[in-house]
């Protein structure tokens, strides 16, 4: 899942800016795992957000009736500088990788700009509501 927290990506731009995030969520060793691939600059909030496995995001995976459900809750520091207030605007996208023997054999993406070159300006708008 990716976030353009300041909604400042341009459609023709490729690559992340210093306010963007990319998280990988999955199961490793039978346990849910969250890995931050890219995090925003600490210039916005003085909080370091290095890449790596993190425990801040609450993440659960459950299987029910042959279906798999993923649930995640991202605390404020994991999406900063996004302002968590009604009306705040960001861009986001989601990708589901199709894997076989540890290699990606395909993917499904919610919007363009996430499966290949990263292009936050192509992601969908998201508005926080009360």
Model-derived features with residue positions:
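Structural preference for beta-rich elements and adjacent junctions enriched in aromatics
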Residues: 1-130
